[in-house]
Amino acid sequence: MTKRQSKQSNRKSVASQVRSIVESMAEQKRFAFLTNTNTVTTAGTVINLSNNIVQGDDLVNRTGDQIKTIHQTLLTRCTGITNSQSFRFIWFRDNTNRGTTPAVTEVLDSASITSQYNPTTFQQKRFTVFQDFMLDTSIVGRVIVHRTAVDKKRRAIFYNGAASVAASNGPGATFVLVIGSHATGQYDVTAEIVYLDM
């Protein structure tokens, strides 16, 4: 190893140690978000998950404009009503958000349950998809179906404001897109985020 490589290695080691110390001193918090009895649409809906962690002094609030996730869980539940139908859930992170909620057609190429991802935004690496799954319900047998998805990777989420509004979204904001094959069924979404308050 050359002297230059040794210095770079030492710098990385020191930076890693400092990061570890800062994270060990940060307060670990837990936030749960529930939206229930929503009617699915064939055009799709994007639900903001992370901007519900508002700035404040409470146990579930953040003190600044950044958190680091330790563990995220998404629970989904669908109920078929009138028709047997499919529900598609896309749980994702917006890597470059600047105070908006992404449109369905920014994530998908078209507002359709069978659509591929939007090639432009994904080529730009705007979104990171955690999970993309379909749940099928039947009004005869499987009236209610559910699924749990987990992300255990540590990820930074930044905020542009204190309140629970789209304008507060920053890079790393997390969302779930829900779209159905029929506009009759209902769904529930619960998100739990365990995070370090940075």
Curated annotation (Swiss-Prot):
It is found in: Virion. Its main location: virion. GO terms for cellular component: viral capsid. The keyword RNA-binding does not apply. GO terms for molecular function: structural molecule activity. The keyword Cell division does not apply. Keywords: Capsid protein, Virion. This is Coat protein.
